Structure formats: C-alpha cells, structure tokens
Regions:
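An acidic/histidine-cluster motif and surrounding catalytic segment
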Residues: 2-130
Length: 130
C-alpha cells in the first residue's frame, strides 16, 4: 500500500533523527523544510503519525500535568527540543468525517489565540490543511 511506502520513506530519510512526524493535520505553523519534510513549530488536529518511541521517552514528563488536549501538548514538546515534522499524505488516506469531534474546546475569549509558545501568532500565520 502506498501510504505505508510513504511512511517508510520518512523512516529511511530521517533514521532516528526525529521524535514525531504527522501525515494529517488541520493546521500547522511551519518552521523549515528538511528534505521532503516540513519541520513545524505548532501542529493541531493530527490523525496519522509516526512516533520514534525511544526518542520520545525523554519527553514523557512534559505530558504531565495533562492540562490541555494532547494536540496542544506538541508545541510544549517542540519548545523543549522535540523534532516534529509534517508530510502531507492526505492523497493516500481516507479520513472519516461523519462524526463531530469529541474533543472539548475551551472558550478563552481570544478568538485569534491558539498557541502558548507563540502567543503573537495569528490564524493568518497558520498553514491550513483539510
């Protein structure tokens, strides 16, 4: 299956030099381009991903306390040095959108605010997916 071939190509390209790579997201704040991958500063609404479990062990402590949805914890990990990438593989997957999100969202009164690490970034800075 081509999806698995594409994911394997990321493993072949990065080896052990990454913590996470996402293949689907609704929005992201790009950083730099590295080979076929886009390094990100912030990413949200991820559905398909590759995690280097051994490299992620050093970041486990930053998941606690779980004071935010796990998608929003990624920016904290990136701020601590985690190498997080995105590669658009949506042409190889089908996302079931027949149900509403089960994720609780908190009304904070700041419509353009989305990141603790980048509080001055606005939705205009975000690269949107699908």
């Amino acid at each position: 299956d081509e999806l698995y071939n594409q994911i394997q190509s990321v493993i072949d390209e990065k080896g052990d030099d990454f913590e996470m790579c996402f293949f689907h997201c609704l929005s992201r704040l790009p950083d730099t381009k590295e080979g076929t991958l886009e390094k990100v500063k912030w990413i949200s609404s991820t559905k398909c991903y590759l995690v280097n479990v051994n490299n992620m062990k050093k970041y486990n402590k930053y998941f606690y306390p779980m004071d935010n949805h796990v998608d929003m914890k990624h920016e904290d990990l990136i701020a601590k040095g985690a190498r997080v990438y995105y590669k658009d593989l949506r042409e190889y997957m089908i996302i079931d959108r027949t149900h509403k999100s089960m994720i609780g969202h908190n009304g904070h009164g700041r419509r353009n605010y989305f990141s603790r690490q980048y509080p001055d970034a606005t939705p205009d800075d975000v690269k949107w997916g699908y």
